[in-house]
């Protein structure tokens, strides 16, 4: 019976395929546009606080916000600190 279903089944029409692809694209863009408007200012404020204590290059600070499962947000902060004189060989 499965063999008969295989030969008699109709292929998906192009409209349905296009709709599925469009839904995937929209979902990907929503995930990428989830960055809140306050994130650049937050990065600037964090950089100012760090610079009070350590001289660093602003490019060495990375702030990212990741959203998971709709109600969970993860703020990731990466700071590359310069080597201190004591730790150099």
Swiss-Prot record:
Instruction: Write down the Gene3D superfamilies for this protein, in alphabetical order.
Output: Cell division topological specificity factor MinE (3.30.1070.10)
The answer to whether keyword Zinc applies is no
Instruction: Check the record and name the InterPro entries matching this protein.
Output: MinE, MinE_sf
Q: Is Cell cycle one of the keywords UniProt gives this record?
A: yes
A GO biological process this protein is involved in? Answer: cell division
Superkingdom of the organism of origin: Bacteria
Known SUPFAM superfamilies for this protein?
A: Cell division protein MinE topological specificity domain (SSF55229)
Keyword annotations: Cell cycle, Cell division
* Pfam families reported in the protein's UniProt record: MinE
Query: What family name appears in the similarity comment?
Result: Belongs to the MinE family.
Output the HAMAP family linked to this UniProt entry: MinE
Could you tell me what this protein does? Prevents the cell division inhibition by proteins MinC and MinD at internal division sites while permitting inhibition at polar sites. This ensures cell division at the proper site by restricting the formation of a division septum at the midpoint of the long axis of the cell.
What's the protein called, per UniProt? Answer: Cell division topological specificity factor
Task: Record the organism.
Answer: Klebsiella pneumoniae (strain 342)
Q: What is the lineage of its organism?
A: Bacteria, Pseudomonadati, Pseudomonadota, Gammaproteobacteria, Enterobacterales
State the encoding gene: minE
